[in-house]
Amino acid sequence: MNFFRFPVQLQLLISTVLGPCLGLEFTGLQGQWARYLRWDASTRSDLSFQFKTDVSTALILYFDDGGFCDFLQLMVVEGKLQLQFSIDCAETTVVSDKRVNDSSWHSATLSRYNLRTVLGLDGVSKWAEVRPLRQYMKIVSDLFLGGVPQDIRISVLTLPTVKDLPPFKGIIRELKYNSKEPILLSSQRVRMDIEGICMENPCENGGTCSVVDGEPLCDCSKTEYVGRFCNEEANNIPGFAHMMMADQAKGKAREENVATFRGSEFFCYDLSQNPIQSSSDEITLSFKTWQRNGLILHTGKSADYVNLALKDGAVSLVINLGSGAFEAIVEPVNGKFNDNSWHDVKVTRNLRQHSGIGHAMVNKLHCLVTISVDGILTTTGYTQEDYTMLGSDDFFYVGGSPSTADLPGSPVSNNFMGCLKEVVYKNNDIRLELSRLARIVDPKMKIQGDVVFKCENVATLDPISFETPEAYISLPKWNTKRMGSISFDFRTTEPNGLILFTHGKPQERKDARSQKNTKVDFFAVELLDGSLYLLLDMGSGTIKVKATQNKVNDGAWYHVDIQRDGRSGTISVNSRRTPFTASGENEILDLEGDMYLGGLPDSRGSLILPTELWTAMLNYGYVGCIRDLFIDGRSKDIRQIAEAQNGAGIKPSCNKMSGKQCDSYPCKNKGLCKEGWNRFICDCTGTGYWSRTCEREASILSYDGSMYMKVVMPTVMHTEAEDVSLRFMSQRAYGLLMATTSRDSADTLRLELDGSRVKLTVNLDCIRINCNSSKGPETLYAGQKLNDNEWHTVRVIRRGKSYKLTVDDDVAEGQMVGDHTRLEFHNIETGVMTERRFVSMIPSSFIGHLQSLKFNGLLYIDLCKNGDIDFCELNARFGMRSIIADPVTFKSKNSYLSLATLQAYTSMHLFFQFKTTSADGFILFNSGDGSDFIAVELVKGYIHYVFNLGNGPNVIKGNSERALHDNQWHNVVITRDNSNVHTLKVDAKAVSQVVNGAKNLDLKGDLFIAGLGPNMYNNLPKLVASREGFKGCLASVDLNGRLPDLINDALFRSGQIERGCEVGFTKADLKGPSTTCQEDSCANMGICIQQWENYTCDCSMTSYTGTHCNDPGTTYIFGKGGGLISFNWPANERPSTRTDRLTVGFSTSLKDGILIRIDSAPGLGDYLMLHIEQGKIGVTFNIGTADITVQESSTAVNDGKYHVVRFTRNGGNATLQVDNWAINEHFPSGNSDNERIQMANKKIPFKYARPVEEWLQEKGRQLTIFNTQATITIGGSDRKRPFQGQLSGLYYNGLKVLNMAAQGNPNIKINGSVRLVGEVPAAGSARTTALPPEMSTAFIETTTTMSTTTTRKHRTPPTIQTTDDMVSSAECSSDDEDFAECEGHAGGLGGELVFPVIVKDPLELPSVATRTPSIPFPPTLTIIETTKESLSMATEAGVPCLSDGGSDDCGDDDDDDDDDGLMISGYGSGEAYDSNLPPTDDEDFYTTFSLVTDKTLSSSTFEGGYKAHAPKWGSKDFRPNKVFDSGRTTTASFSPKLSRSTTTSTPPKLPAGKMNHRELKPQPDIVLLPLPTSYEVDNTKMKSPLITSPMFRNVPTAIPTEPGIRRVPGASEVVRESSSTTGMVVGIVAAAALCILILLYAMYKYRNRDEGSYQVDETRNYITNSAQSNGAVMKDKQQSTKSGNKKQKNKDKEYYV
């Protein structure tokens, strides 16, 4: 036997047998330690122990992760406990407030909860938290107590200094891991002294100490004293007392009568057979607890009882002998009795004679009651006279009862939690050792629950803090029927919050109007305006009881105790009782479902909220602390419940932060800061911002008089309290701001502009529900002159009958008359009131802007915009937009109309907008009785307001800084108030005039607009200057609150009057309408397309629509639940593309989601996905190899603002741009494909095809074609990444899918939470087939469109086409460019073959492909004079060949060219150009606008007779793919082998060294390049549009398979050929023009002999398609050294050939 191991084995045996009785005595010697099995405290666990020591510095326990980062060390430092721990190298320290080196016993606990660690000392907890990346603690070592072994290597210690710390000296006992004793592995120099507790003898007067269940027990048998510590004198009965105490001590030494109660357990002793009848008695017991409240002992009923309880940490005694209660409270001097230490209680009642004063000195018998705690604190008193006997035949309850709240005289409602020991009742007749009787299971003693007959640690009911109003926890159903009780403590500094709520099953009840309403039984406690309220409904109506007189939001703890028995009950707040009685006769409270603590869940669809519960209606969640929740006397561990539910915003502690939270000025943008509970509260009302710190800009809605936003409630709403706020801006004096409306009643709460003031109308339809007293609508007014086009803030607060309206700083208050206070509504409407059935007078529609509409805590505009609510209808436009409502154009000065008489007798508010280039003209005139009249006119460009109220005419002239006939919109406001103050305001300039005398304007007859009738000009009053009508546009006409429709409401119309105001004037030319592209012609980066008579805007890549790209595109809102819009191409129309263009506008607050995804046919795996990840937007696509991602990584886009994202792909190259931010580009790595292209053009024997393919794969080739696109899905819910927010103006390769969805396209399905904003777009604005009919700047290089089979055959055209079709074959759709399986046509590239089907139809006007191929540029430029006619001719003859095959390919194929359009550069407003960006090597992209892949070259606008100028290009050159040097110039070399599969043309000649700058600055005088383009075909007139586009970096050339074809045909691409006669004429003209041009070319070359030459750099050429193989221009990485800054002079009228 190994004798050295014997002591350790003996120690282990002792520790195993004795368990918690074991005490570890540490001597403090160096080298001592005790080693326990590892404590798993990685995430959640508790460790507890008791200790005492007298040293000021010592190590108590330590463990770590083996030498890396994590450790935990508990020490005594300067007499206090110090906890130091680290998680993932994030370290912190916690120090106790109390000193522990006092040689007294202390209890310590360590609680681990993920990143938080709590140190508990004698019931006081302190905690700390770290913020590492890892969320848990790593633990490798075992746990060491008192020290660590000295032979442990320092390298394995995370905290090496632990070896040098002083060892612990003292005793440690009751070490437990989660209430279980750990295994002692080994120890050194530690004594396992069971009697260590008695080292310092607590027994007095010679008593002997022993340990029982870990506690000291004094044997007083050899002394003359008794008591726990032998400190009380024994009875003077010789010998008997000593015998009794000796026997008792022996019994205690054997087994002590102690029990643990956890809130649900209690003893019940039946007194029915032996009733108590005594005049003197004594109760003794000891208790130990952490709990503040709990029943200790009770006996008796009705008015004869004794109740002993713990109340708020003090001992409470209530005795009633029949004539009234005697109450006594014993409190310690410092602290509370709930300190988890043993306390002895002794209650005695003795019959005494008491001399009564005032009773003639007659001695009476009274009961003297004495209560003492720990033998020191004593309270003495007398029970009331007449009754001296305690009689009880009921039960003796110990530790609790079945319903503690219902016990007579009980000051608490919950049972005891802790340990009770030696509970003894005795009187002159009996002695009941209740604890012993329970332990031995006496027949008369009933034990409820699982009682443990030893003292165990009872987990404390830790408080929790609700840190945000949204935080809440759900509790199980409250099983209460006839009676029940709830108690809790709360602490807060905030005035409002819902604390408790639960309700029962919905029931149909009939109200006073005999209509069925859904009602429920419910119970609630709320904090409102600092007062506590109890609300109860048991089926017969709601009662609302105010339980406090003073405010209770002062940060102190308040104890709430609610007890109910049937209909009656009491609510106590800090012992102040308030009785209540429920309505009706029902005594059953029928509840169902969860009880909510602290607030309500976001999804409240299943909850029926009572109207009387104002905090629920107002969305006021509770912020503060809750502790000690007891339901029906049983404790609820709300901390554990909160942790299990993982409730957000809940913290397991309650500490009040020091200082004021607003001292740091956290509220931005002038938000008002208020102090909350450990938080600041920012009131953002009136700022235009929202969020916790008022940092996020609130969404703005713009209204034009016909627009609205309507929030439809999911169910009918009933409220008695409302908080409403909003901001508005308007130039009108009238208009609906906000209104609640009902489908069933006239109930409304309405805010509107009325005479430039805000009017509040509250109408509670009392008559409809048979109310006794009804006054009708209540109204309030506030504010003055609010139609000043400035932001104003409106607030409405209603609480029952009282209500208040605040406009800016103007406050108006009112009190409602009548008993009815409930508001019913189904909708919240803005802008236009659509629910009009119960409205006698419909309010005027609103024109202006609304922002920050907040109704009962919900920001409805932003919720609607972000898709957070599904019940929102709107057609108002988001954003601060210029509002031009219902414009009408008067095209001549003889045009006018008349309306009904203007009603402006006492006051007047007129508003209109106008736009004109004429300096004079009548705008408005109305005559009246006598000399009364009103006139508004434009005189020499200034507004005149002329009027006569009977005292003679007056004129007020506008004081504009400049004349107003500048073709810009101007705003005019004319007002006359009750004081006869007339004001004329034009734009921001106002003029006022006070007119004395008559105040009324009595008008008669028609109101004339924009002019007068015949002969009326001769009879105009004085001061009226105009003698002709108004020519221009009028809009937003407001006639004293009436918004007339000028055309439909007109009584008479004369002349040319049209709806709308589309005729515009440019800045440079105000003499007539603009017909040429200007810088500001197209908004939002739209592309201006010049035509002969006018211009149009291509808005495809803007997300906008309209004639000038300034109207929002079709918009859908995707809601919270996730929605999906899916488009499926028909099986025979699935396209394959080499280039893709995608644009969409969006706004969202989402961090992750898929916006759009395009997938190929099943089995192919190609896809393209636009998605948001971590708030950043990007595109990921796969076209045959690996995923390629392009991302905007610099800035997050989930800020709720509107963004436009543009994506283009050309092969493996891609660009992504958000708004006008920097462009993100991707260029694939790897070698050039020149070798591959060359090999593709050779005849490869079949047996070598596979090795060649494998070799290409080894060379890292990338595929370039997006094959067989089958589906477009929008919304992402099909891939578990749903998008939430707005999507607008989606454009993908010609498809406007959202337009198609709005028009009900049969190929589109809509599922889930998807809502269309506004009206369905007009027909024709969306495509219903695979590709669009117009593609002016929307070129798609389509390779496979009609089929997915690999068989080469002609396909039947789609049914929508009735003309000649050119159809592409479905070559190799499953693999982009496999040479072996799919060998291409001779000269072709990988199956990129199309077979034209040409049917000549001489009856149709000729049409040209809507997309034009690019023309490569040689280094010289030829210029000739241009006229309109020559332009038309040049476009037919100026492009002699669009093939590279030489003159053979330019024969009859071009006979039928009808390309008489011009390609002209232009640029939409808002485009960004940056010449400093680095050049790229993607030859298929544009020179300047890298997001557009059009086949056009940019030039600028005409001046006068289309004068063209030489370009101002950058310093880099365009380069063809293959070049040869010829002196100083370089020209393209064409390969005849590729002539059958590519299309180019003889290029125009540009100065060498002038092209291919990375970001070319657009100039207004770039040369014109005639290129074939599209027609707008009708049977009456043929238009030849001039197409303009941005300065493209480089454009991929189209790849038709036959010469003469201008583009790649898609599924809907049509090439129409006219008759052969027309073709012959065109051919002759083309040949003649060619000869002239060659002559001019030679002359120009001779004149420009000093031009530079090209350099060729093919290091970064990746994609070499057919365009580059045939002369398409390339980009260079180096700048030309000669002509970088050279400018071309051109003063002649010229254009390019």
Swiss-Prot record:
Which CDD domains does this entry report, sorted A to Z?
Answer: EGF_CA, LamG
How is this protein positioned relative to the membrane?
A: Single-pass type I membrane protein
Composition bias, Acidic residues: 1446-1461
Domain Laminin G-like, by residue range, is 24-198, 258-455, 462-654, 700-872, 886-1061, 1114-1314
Cytoplasmic topological domain: 1644-1697
From which residue to which does the signal peptide run? Answer: 1-23
Specify the species: Danio rerio
Gene Ontology molecular function, alphabetical: metal ion binding
What spans are recorded as compositionally biased (Polar residues)? 1527-1547
- What name goes with this protein? Neurexin-3a
